[in-house]
């Protein structure tokens, strides 16, 4: 039966080797298939020309390589690309962002999100389910195969991965870690740990697990300089407070691929963008002795939000204060906002929880009609 076949797409190198041993085949054949899938983009066993006929026949009986369907894709004038990907009747978004010298793919880990951060549009649609490892790595497979390498002006090679799309990746640890293993495998995409970044809102126990089992680069969605405000806008803080979070971050900085943690801080007008907030943030990070780089993200408004984007003057003032106090600070440029691909807009084409499937099916029907 089709449903009994193993989808090889989501198996990291060890898992695919174990599968081949279980069907009486050698590990080196597993590595051949692994390379065909991820390095060469081939998903037809018959096209894997260095495999024997009998092995290809056995694989067709016992395994499959299933790639989710791309419902539609969009390209922004600034080179940003976005895909809406079918994951079994629901949909997730993947975004490719061009910047000087690199191409970053923003990968989703869940359909929706459980954390319900007050300023994030993804959380407003509710939570459906975790993505499988195959559905996570498929986003990179699709991007690597469908992006043109160059348009004469831009290089569309994926050089960096950020697990910053829809969902909280550490709430889907068991599937995200094997997918990241594939991203970093030299027989697959060959990205270094420094080029794969996982962003978390602060699932503290899993930060320790991540350091032990993967050790990719870590970014933390902080967004507030104290527990009172963070409890309000990042509710997981009620379970794992700032002290616990920064303790985990300090250890990760000591042992991870970078000697600092990137803290993401979404600037929301008159909520967390006051000079007093900047002062408190500086005092917090210095007192905890966490090596930090700060990435300021101007809030991206979406329909129904009560929040506003700060003025450029307020953003500049906040940044200047942090820099004056010794912190490397960047302001994230808004990219892809004309196709709802900017940070915080990843629910634009994916629907609220109650209407998700109906609207998805309508989108699918409209796409097929075209």
Swiss-Prot record:
GO CC term, one of those recorded: cytoplasm
Stored Pfam families: Radical_SAM, RlmN_N
The UniProt record lists the keyword Iron-sulfur: yes
Cofactors (names): [4Fe-4S] cluster
Main location group: cytoplasm
Source domain of life: Bacteria
Catalysed reactions, as listed in the record: adenosine(2503) in 23S rRNA + 2 reduced [2Fe-2S]-[ferredoxin] + 2 S-adenosyl-L-methionine = 2-methyladenosine(2503) in 23S rRNA + 5'-deoxyadenosine + L-methionine + 2 oxidized [2Fe-2S]-[ferredoxin] + S-adenosyl-L-homocysteine; adenosine(37) in tRNA + 2 reduced [2Fe-2S]-[ferredoxin] + 2 S-adenosyl-L-methionine = 2-methyladenosine(37) in tRNA + 5'-deoxyadenosine + L-methionine + 2 oxidized [2Fe-2S]-[ferredoxin] + S-adenosyl-L-homocysteine
Location(s) in or outside the cell: Cytoplasm
Disulfide bond sites: 106-343
Domain Radical SAM core: 99-337
Entry binding sites for S-adenosyl-L-methionine: 167-168, 199, 221-223, 300
Record carries keyword Cytoplasm: yes
Family annotation (CDD domains): Radical_SAM (cd01335)
Active site: 93 (proton acceptor), 343 (s-methylcysteine intermediate)
Enzyme class: transferase
Keywords: 4Fe-4S, Cytoplasm, Disulfide bond, Iron, Iron-sulfur, Metal-binding, Methyltransferase, rRNA processing, S-adenosyl-L-methionine, Transferase, tRNA processing
Cofactor remark: Binds 1 [4Fe-4S] cluster. The cluster is coordinated with 3 cysteines and an exchangeable S-adenosyl-L-methionine.
Positions that bind [4Fe-4S] cluster: 113, 117, 120
Function: Specifically methylates position 2 of adenine 2503 in 23S rRNA and position 2 of adenine 37 in tRNAs. m2A2503 modification seems to play a crucial role in the proofreading step occurring at the peptidyl transferase center and thus would serve to optimize ribosomal fidelity.
Something else known: Reaction proceeds by a ping-pong mechanism involving intermediate methylation of a conserved cysteine residue.
Family of the protein in this entry: Belongs to the radical SAM superfamily. RlmN family.
Protein name, UniProt field: Dual-specificity RNA methyltransferase RlmN
Gene behind this protein: rlmN
């Amino acid at each position: 039966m089709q449903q009994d076949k193993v989808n090889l797409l989501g198996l990291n190198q060890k898992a695919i080797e174990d599968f081949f041993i279980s069907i009486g085949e050698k590990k080196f054949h597993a590595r051949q298939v692994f390379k065909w899938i991820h390095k060469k983009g081939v998903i037809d066993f018959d096209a894997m020309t260095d495999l024997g006929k009998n092995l290809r026949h056995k694989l067709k009986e016992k395994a499959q390589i299933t790639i989710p369907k791309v419902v539609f894709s969009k390209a922004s004038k600034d080179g940003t690309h976005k895909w809406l990907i079918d994951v079994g009747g629901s949909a997730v978004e993947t975004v490719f962002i061009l910047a000087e010298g690199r191409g970053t793919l923003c990968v989703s880990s869940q359909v929706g999100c459980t954390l319900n951060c007050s300023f994030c549009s993804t959380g407003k649609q509710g939570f459906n389910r975790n993505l499988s490892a195959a559905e996570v790595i498929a986003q990179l497979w699709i991007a690597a195969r469908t992006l043109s390498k160059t348009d004469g002006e831009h290089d569309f090679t994926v050089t960096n991965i950020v697990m910053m799309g829809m969902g909280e990746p550490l709430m889907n640890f068991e599937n995200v870690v094997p997918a990241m293993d594939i991203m970093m495998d030299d027989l697959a995409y060959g990205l270094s740990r420094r080029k794969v970044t996982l962003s978390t809102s602060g699932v503290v126990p899993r930060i320790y697990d991540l350091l032990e089992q993967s050790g990719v680069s870590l970014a933390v969605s902080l967004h507030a300089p104290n527990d009172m405000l963070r409890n309000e806008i990042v509710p997981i803080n009620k379970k794992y407070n700032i002290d616990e979070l920064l303790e985990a971050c300090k250890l990760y900085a000591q042992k991870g691929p970078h000697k600092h943690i990137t803290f993401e801080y979404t600037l929301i007008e008159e909520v967390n963008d006051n000079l007093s907030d900047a002062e408190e943030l500086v005092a917090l990070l210095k007192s905890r002795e966490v090596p930090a780089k700060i990435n300021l993200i101007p809030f991206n408004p979406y329909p129904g939000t009560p929040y506003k984007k700060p003025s450029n003057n307020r953003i500049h003032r906040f940044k200047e204060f942090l820099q004056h106090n010794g912190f490397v600070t960047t302001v994230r440029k808004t990219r892809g906002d004309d196709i709802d691909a900017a940070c915080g807009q990843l629910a634009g084409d994916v629907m609220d929880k109650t209407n998700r499937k109906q609207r998805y099916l309508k989108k699918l029907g409209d796409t097929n009609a075209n």
